[in-house]
Amino acid sequence: MNKALQRELKLFFLIPKNIYLPISIFGIIFVIFLVLDLDNSLNYASSFIASFITIFIISENTFKDDHANGYLEQKLSESGISDIILYLLAKWIVNVFFVFMPIAAISLIFQGHEISLELFGIYVIMLSTLYFFFNLGSAISLKRNNSLNALLIIPLLIPFIILVKGIFVDGQLEPNFWFLFAYFVFASSFIFYTILQVLRIQSR
């Protein structure tokens, strides 16, 4: 795990766009909504849309560079299943700490929420769930170099969006949190496994 995590950390910090691109995309979209001076009730919508688009864009490149330089194909052909799982987990962990957490903090501040560990954790879970779903689209469209398959994933997220709205807009933490957590478990298990299998097929 340490080796995979070290590699992802090096890639994140040695490639400038990995540092500034996610927060820049989120910031630009969010500022546009602020300039439009939308009603306070739409603060959630503006931050969610900004988060949604940001995760969608960065997920397009999750496997792109590793596929282009042959690392992904080599990894899938030479490594065992456990190494591939660690490879995917390392990518997610780096994004959690350096992309999702900053976005969650900024979003909660501008939504007027107190940054409690509970809401902060829920927001990170929300972003992680989006990440897994969009990574599936990225894996499917790896050789086609388009976002069509990622767009096809979006309808699967409609119930998820309703749950998140129930938490952050309606303030109904129960039972929405547990449904949201179930969505995260589904994404981090079944969707994660599907990503793994799709990548193995793509490497043939």
List each model region and its residues.
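Aromatic- and glycine-rich beta-strand/loop motifs that create alpha-glucan
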Residues: 1-22
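A structural motif at transmembrane helix-loop-helix junctions in multipass membrane proteins
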Residues: 122-157, 203-204
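Secretory targeting signals
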Residues: 98-129
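Selective transmembrane-helix segments that form parts of the transport pathway or gating/packing helices
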Residues: 82-109, 184
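Residue-level hotspots within the lipid-embedded alpha helices of multi-pass solute transporters
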Residues: 49-50, 58, 62, 92-96, ...
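Helix-loop-helix units of permease transmembrane domains in multi-pass membrane transporters
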Residues: 62-95
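Membrane-interfacial helix-loop-helix junctions in multi-pass membrane proteins
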Residues: 163-204
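Hydrophobic alpha-helical transmembrane segments of multi-pass membrane transport/permease proteins
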Residues: 15-40, 44-56, 151-164, 183-194
